[in-house]
Amino acid sequence: MTAVADKQKQRAYELDFLRGFALIMMIFMHSAWDIRYEYGVDTFGFLEADWFWAIVHPFFIVIFVGVSGICCTFSKNNLFRGLKLLGVAAGLALATWLITTYLKIYCLIIFNVLAMLAVSILLYSLIEKLEKTAKADPKLVNALIGMAGAFFAALGSKLEWLDYSTDNLIFLPVGFKMNSMPYMADYMPLLPWLGVFLIGCLIGRVCYSERRSLLPAKNKTAKAITAPVEFVGRHSLIIYLVHQPIVYGIMYLIFMLIRRG
């Protein structure tokens, strides 16, 4: 095996591709939402369909969050990663609060996918620390992670059917129903998505224990085809952060020119 092929084999490029593909679809859905609801263009009717919100939308989020859980098992310092991402999420929340409050552009984001992933990564960091300190059997830890993931995912899917409500905003990140839910441009609670993340962690611990790709090295043609999507997957954080203002800005200019014309 050549040095290039060995390097490619060591990096689980299939995870980059899956995360990149999921993020591209999320960007498309955000763009479609802006066009239909922000600019009033009667298109992308699938956004009104129950099947889209019940199947398609969750499907891509499951891929993105699950792969994030898998990748978490590759990291040597999840505490740092989690704190860094939490700082980014807090900065985004502050920025959107200022924009919403003073510019009257209603884009408030309190707890979105970045905050959810940050808390999940920090939780997994704690699990790693406890596992190492207690010298626990990895198989037992895997079983506990799997059961916790399945429980949180199942509980999250049933929350809306439970007869309860609360006024305490401290429960907003968890996913509990709020009596006075603030309008948010994006929202992703811990339930059920922490469960999906933990299931991803389990897959990473079991299937990617050697931290290597499960697929053979790609040839030049396959590499050329998948490289753009993998690039998006490798740089998902920065692309996620900048895509909405960029897309919204481009659309604003386009529709401004159309209306003037």
Predicted features by range, described:
Residues 1-261:
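Alpha-helical transmembrane segments and their immediate juxtamembrane cytosolic regions
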